[in-house]
Swiss-Prot record:
This is Deoxyguanosinetriphosphate triphosphohydrolase. Residues 66-273 form the HD domain. dGTPase preferentially hydrolyzes dGTP over the other canonical NTPs. Its cofactor is Mg(2+). The keyword Hydrolase applies. InterPro entries: dGTP_triP_hydro_central_sf (IPR023293), dGTPase (IPR006261), dGTPase-like (IPR050135), dNTPase_1 (IPR020779), HD/PDEase_dom (IPR003607), HD_domain (IPR006674). One of its GO terms (biological process) is dGTP catabolic process. Keywords: Hydrolase, Magnesium. The keyword Magnesium applies. The gene is dgt.
Amino acid sequence: MAQIDFRKKINWHRRYRSPQGVKTEHEILRIFESDRGRIINSPAIRRLQQKTQVFPLERNAAVRTRLTHSMEVQQVGRYIAKEILSRLKELKLLEAYGLDELTGPFESIVEMSCLMHDIGNPPFGHFGEAAINDWFRQRLHPEDAESQPLTDDRCSVAALRLRDGEEPLNELRRKIRQDLCHFEGNAQGIRLVHTLMRMNLTWAQVGGILKYTRPAWWRGETPETHHYLMKKPGYYLSEEAYIARLRKELNLALYSRFPLTWIMEAADDISYCVADLEDAVEKRIFTVEQLYHHLHEAWGQHEKGSLFSLVVENAWEKSRSNSLSRSTEDQFFMYLRVNTLNKLVPYAAQRFIDNLPAIFAGTFNHALLEDASECSDLLKLYKNVAVKHVFSHPDVEQLELQGYRVISGLLEIYRPLLSLSLSDFTELVEKERVKRFPIESRLFHKLSTRHRLAYVEAVSKLPSDSPEFPLWEYYYRCRLLQDYISGMTDLYAWDEYRRLMAVEQ
């Protein structure tokens, strides 16, 4: 196992800046303060205020959006980071681990990773993801790319259909089809930060949001040693070279994770579990009393002094005894949140320290709060009650189905841009309006300038005389559409769909 030295991981250099010499502690902290400013002032963060947490298109400002959720995750991440650093200081290990002059950057990277962790999520959350992937899967049929004979290939895009005698090109076709059918919010977050918004963050800060290490074009089983880390796609083919450079800059082995990402993940797990239940009470899906009984029933028999007793029962009893000063709802969730944090944050911090050799190497194949402990059981309790009584509620399911339809419908509306031939689409990009393509011209004008420029830049770097050019061009054209639609807020997607379907009120 390599020696633990965080100076080798907290890399404060940037992709688009020439290498700099040795910096003082204050100068390094200023570099990460610059990251904070870039992130907090970015449009991607502002858009989170109109993206779904659990309840799409919610008008009640007391119910969480992705932005308010991310701010809560940021606070919990800071708490865990400080707890880790405090414990390492008590153990006199800060200097040994190269952290004595990097405590500020350590905290800042965790905080900003937490704030950014959802920026790649499309409108309507996981149902938006599913809509994008299903729509592309129905047209590209990535499963047919493994089939024999090649005549069984149902891919509707001629450039991406497998052909006899073109094995090197066929392998690229397989990768592209697989990649486009695995849109994922975390992978889109990497693309946003690097390719679309050109935020030019430090290598360490970007490493903090690389939650999953599986390429989106991966086919087959994942290695048992990395099955958790590769649970979902973490980056796209379009960012392959950038991630390879990121791994080099952060001393990460293939499919390994940046150490501070485990803290961001734990902060997210702690935050959303309680928040989803609180939002459900705010939405009157159930009362606080009903929630307590759901939790009690799901946990089962317990003794005085058990974690359930110390966290949930304690919150319930205190909220009932102090009901004159504040509402029972407010009291209950205040105590539940405080009790949960007071138990889970120290536990997550100690798990991080206990497993630091594997975490530093990037190979710890678990979440900090997923083990056989009571703390893990408490998180599972919150999640299970939310799944059973919140996510399955008819109002929630109806909104999710509407969201799925909106995203599918928008993709269908913009499909003419994907149906154009390479030469016709190239003409449209160059002229912006082509008389014989009136619909396509108007659809193209609606695309964001940022996304169009990203497409143009990517295609301009390709050798136009290469047999791979038509494949890559179509890939980036699909990315253009995915970038545009996934970047919409819930409300904008809803309004855009209604406008283009001519059903605006």
